[in-house]
A protein has these predicted regions:
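Surface-exposed extracellular loop regions of Gram-negative outer-membrane beta-barrel proteins
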Residues: 1-15, 19-25, 143-154, 174-198
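Outer-membrane beta-barrel strand-turn architecture
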Residues: 22, 30-34, 77, 87-89, ...
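Outer membrane beta-barrel strand-and-loop segments of large Gram-negative receptors
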Residues: 74, 80, 93-149, 158-176
Length: 293
């Protein structure tokens, strides 16, 4: 249940929205054998506009870009279905489908010549379907463990702009790889890479992005001390590049901030976990003796 009310500081601009809906969730699981497990789930969800989406005031970023909220936004409702298969707890594949009515996305409109006004609006439909595959704890050699994730997503957005029916649909590949290396009992390292392909996002098209992270760790003083040296976005390839096209509007965003981070972390453990567990166990035994159990 939801209830919105407010005033946009303009005469005769009061607004009220009331709604009542049910949001069921169903999850089923079937074990064919001890190694093969099938899962099926369905859920209906609501996404409400946040404060910034409803704020009627305009923010001026520069001479070419203004952004504001939209007091006429409605909540969006989505139906989500997933069918999954799990093999021996290390391999999982999932087929998913989602249909959203009144999806809340940013819209881009031309105002007064070359100025772009950005505001959220409800798109008439948004359909997402795809497949997700995950393999965990693969071990090519004794000191090397790998987690792999591959996702294929097809996004299909539909809306009406200036009387024209518009669509933005695209297939997007997503890959993730996490490598863990245990060279010795005290030396270890991690290497991860994540890639997002070209993606449809409302009226916008987001360009591919890649991020590579690396870290190395050393344990010292009988494993009480841990020193970690790490680097994020090693090749500085995780930047935002977006194309926007709609009737009367063609815009390009290319933000290339340097997101590379090099850091060092130091951790000291003052008491071993095994000693803590043993102390807790001793207290439990003493308490049992005290009450004569």
């Amino acid at each position: 249940h939801g209830d919105f009310g407010g005033n946009t500081q303009q005469k005769d601009s009061s607004f009220t929205t009331n709604y009542f809906h049910l949001f069921p969730t169903i999850a089923l699981q079937y074990g064919l054998t001890s190694e093969h497990l099938f899962q099926l789930s369905y859920g209906r969800r609501i996404t409400r506009p946040n404060y910034g989406d409803l704020n009627p005031f305009t923010y001026i970023f520069d001479d070419y870009t203004h952004e504001g909220g939209n007091t006429k936004l409605h909540p969006s409702f989505s139906d989500n279905i997933e069918l999954g298969y799990v093999y021996r707890d290390w391999f999982q594949t999932v087929l998913f489908f989602s249909h959203t009515d009144d999806a809340i996305m940013k819209s881009y409109r031309e105002q007064e010549g070359r100025r772009i006004y950005v505001m959220p609006q409800n798109l008439s439909s948004y359909v997402q379907t795809g497949m997700r595959v995950h393999a965990a704890n693969l071990s090519p050699v004794s000191f090397w463990k790998v987690n792999l994730t591959a996702i294929g997503i097809y996004n299909n957005y539909g809306w009406t702009e200036q009387g024209q029916k518009m669509k933005n649909r695209m297939f997007t590949p997503i890959f993730g790889c996490m490598n863990q290396f245990a060279f010795t009992s005290v030396w270890s390292a991690e290497l991860s890479a994540n890639y997002n392909g070209r993606m449809a996002y409302g009226q916008a098209t987001v360009h591919p992005a890649l991020e590579v992270n690396v870290g190395i760790q050393k344990k010292m003083f009988r494993n009480r001390c841990t020193v970690t040296l790490f680097a994020k976005d090693v090749f500085n390839t995780n930047y935002q590049k977006v194309d926007i096209q709609s009737p009367g509007v063609q815009a390009f965003v290319d933000e290339r901030h340097n997101k590379r981070v090099l850091g060092i972390a130091f951790a000291w453990r003052f008491q071993k976990g095994s000693e803590t567990k043993e102390s807790r166990r001793k207290k439990e035994i003493d308490e049992t003796k005290r009450v004569n159990l």
